[in-house]
Amino acid sequence: MEEPAAKRPKLSDRSEPLTQRDVVLFQKEALFRQLNRYRAEARAGQVQVEELRRAHGQVGERLAAVCGVVRSVARAVADARGDGDARALCERVAGGDDDEVVARAAEFAAVVAGGLGRGAAAGEGWHRLEAVNSRLAAENAQLAAELGAVRGFYAELLRRYDRDESETVRRVFKVEESEPPRAATPVEESSAKGAASDGEAATAVVEREMQIEELQTEIRVLEDTVAQLTDWKRLNEQELTKLRQMASSAELSQRHPTPPSSSNLSADLQVLRSKVEKLSHENKELAQLNEAYLGKFQQLSADREIFNNRLSAEFQTAQETLKKHNSNLEKDLVRIRTARDELLSKVAVLEAQKSKSDMLEDLEKMLALQQEQLKALSEHKPEPARDAVMKELQDLEKAFKELSQYSNKKYSEYVNQESLMSKLTVEKTKADQKYFAAMRSKDSILIENKNLSKNLSKSNELIQQLKDIEKSLQAKIENLNKQLHISRINEKRLLDSNKTTSLKIMDLTSQLSKANKSSTLVQQECNKLIEEKAKMESKLNDLEIETKNLATKLTYQENKSKKLHKTLVSNGGDNGALAEELENFRTVVYCSLCSKNWKDTVIKTCGHVFCADCCKERLAARMRKCPTCNKGFSSNDLLVVHL
């Protein structure tokens, strides 16, 4: 169901300032102009894409055919050539796809040229054709650039024409127009009728002039085309004559090839035989060297095993001897320490006993002296004062006894203290002896530890030396293994070269016929490529002619548009039909509620189309009726469409 046609919006008066409605209408017309421009570009792009697809298909077919011929030539050349690199390249070209063939075209051409060794005249003609091709390609690029510039100028001219014819542009930018017509009086009406008839006559004259100019333009285009075709025909005849001469010279060279002389073949055979003999002699020498290296390797392996066994046995013997010597030294040290402690204790006891005996001897001497004095006193004769003396003596005796008891008591205490001191001294002496013995044992242990550390360091040095010797022997063994591997590789290489040489000798006799076949195929391929080049040049010439015709038509259309514009301005013609069509298009495309968004949402209950924003606004405001037919709808009745 189509929307009812909305009324055409009116612009505000020019004397008044711009309104929001004028700006919106200006933006809408700008969008329509841009849309028309994009449509024109899209149509031109579609035409170009179709033409390019057709040309691409033709080029793909021709490329496939050319690649097939090149693969066949590569197979023939691979059968003819005996060297490894060229044969491998030909096999890759023959077995690869089109991309592989194109990527290795230059290398394959060099191989074919080296195998043929002739065709200098054809090569010169090919280079000349390549120069002509490059020149035509440059001219084609230049013409394509000119055509693009002309198209851009024509598009810009159309855009300016659309903008100049737009009322909104004139309203926004305040372009001055001619004075509007006043109310017509009867006299003015009659004069207007006469002017209208005169305008129709002038329009007819302008149309006849435009037709005449169009015919003259077509005549000039046809004359230019005929001249270009004549020049192209003359150039093609010259190129055809040159190609026929080149083909005849190539056929003569193929029919009468210069066969290789027998002397050259015999010389090549002699050289190959000498190479084979030299390689066999080198192979024998390498075999002898290989055997000598194997013997040296086995001898070194046996020597290394013997040396390792002997060294390990000596190391074990020295280690056991050192352990036994250390155990004997420890036993002797314990025995010496025990004897020393016993002797020290005996010496201390003897020293204590000696001091006690000396003291007893002194006391005995004192007692003996006192007894002698007592005896001497008792032996004296009595005197007159005997009683007093006796009494005094008794007192002295009593005092002496008390003194003796006291001295004995003190002596006993002293003896006890002396014995205690002697015991403590003995204990202290024993403790000192034990301390000094411990210190001496510590020193001896430190000395033994130092000796053991020295022995251990010497053992580690010996082990490191043995490891270094083992590494050097391992390196020598690896070098011998590498030399053995190299000698085996050389032997294998010599055998392969021997086989390759024999194969080359067998292939030398068949290369001449295969080379002739490959040259024939290459000549056919060259002829096909020349035909393809001629077709491409003819197509390029057609494009040049078409470009010139388009340029001429463009000039004619520009002149025609200018004249039509002048006629329209002078006659004051109305473009109401075009404006009405544009307004109808706007009504169909834009939403009838806001007149600014595209129609993209349809109401399924009635089929009317609006923009999504207006539909959501009406649902949010609880206005759930169609603005056109007042049918109710909900959010589930909305459907997104693409116009």
UniProtKB/Swiss-Prot annotation:
Reactions catalysed according to its record:
S-ubiquitinyl-[E2 ubiquitin-conjugating enzyme]-L-cysteine + [acceptor protein]-L-lysine = [E2 ubiquitin-conjugating enzyme]-L-cysteine + N(6)-ubiquitinyl-[acceptor protein]-L-lysine
Q: Which CDD domains match?
A: RING-HC_Bre1-like (cd16499)
- GO BP term, pick one: transcription by RNA polymerase II
Lineage top rank: taxon? Eukaryota
Q: Where in this chain does the entry annotate a coiled-coil region?
A: 200-233, 262-406, 446-494, 520-555
Localization annotation? Nucleus
Stored SUPFAM superfamilies: RING/U-box (SSF57850)
UniProt pathway annotation: Protein modification; protein ubiquitination
Q: What is this protein called?
A: E3 ubiquitin-protein ligase BRE1
Q: Source species, please?
A: Eremothecium gossypii (strain ATCC 10895 / CBS 109.51 / FGSC 9923 / NRRL Y-1056) (Yeast)
Q: Which gene encodes it?
A: BRE1
